[in-house]
Each structure stands twice: as structure tokens, then as C-alpha cells.
Amino acid sequence: MEALVYTFLLVGTLGIIFFSIFFRDPPRMIK
């Protein structure tokens, strides 16, 4: 159960970093 919590926190942190970079510098591959 503890591993699930740690993985959730890790994914959440990586997700926040990814979205912050994504919205700060929008990729040009979409258009």
C-alpha cells in the first residue's frame, strides 16, 4: 500500500512538472 502512495506522489510530481513546461512553452508539433 505504501508503494502505491509513493508511485502516486511520483507520478503527480512528474505530471505537475510536465504540465508546467507544457503550458510555459507550448510544443509546435500540435499545429
Curated annotation (Swiss-Prot):
It is a single-pass membrane protein. One of its GO terms (biological process) is photosynthesis. The chain crosses the membrane at residues 3-23. One of its GO terms (cellular component) is photosystem II reaction center. Its main location: plastid. Keywords: Chloroplast, Membrane, Photosynthesis, Photosystem II, Plastid, Thylakoid, Transmembrane, Transmembrane helix. This is Photosystem II reaction center protein T. HAMAP family: PSII_PsbT (MF_00808). Found at the monomer-monomer interface of the photosystem II (PS II) dimer, plays a role in assembly and dimerization of PSII. PSII is a light-driven water plastoquinone oxidoreductase, using light energy to abstract electrons from H(2)O, generating a proton gradient subsequently used for ATP formation. The keyword Secreted does not apply. PSII is composed of 1 copy each of membrane proteins PsbA, PsbB, PsbC, PsbD, PsbE, PsbF, PsbH, PsbI, PsbJ, PsbK, PsbL, PsbM, PsbT, PsbY, PsbZ, Psb30/Ycf12, at least 3 peripheral proteins of the oxygen-evolving complex and a large number of cofactors. It forms dimeric complexes. The gene is psbT. It is found in: Plastid, Chloroplast thylakoid membrane. Pfam families: PsbT. Coiled coil: none annotated. Belongs to the PsbT family.
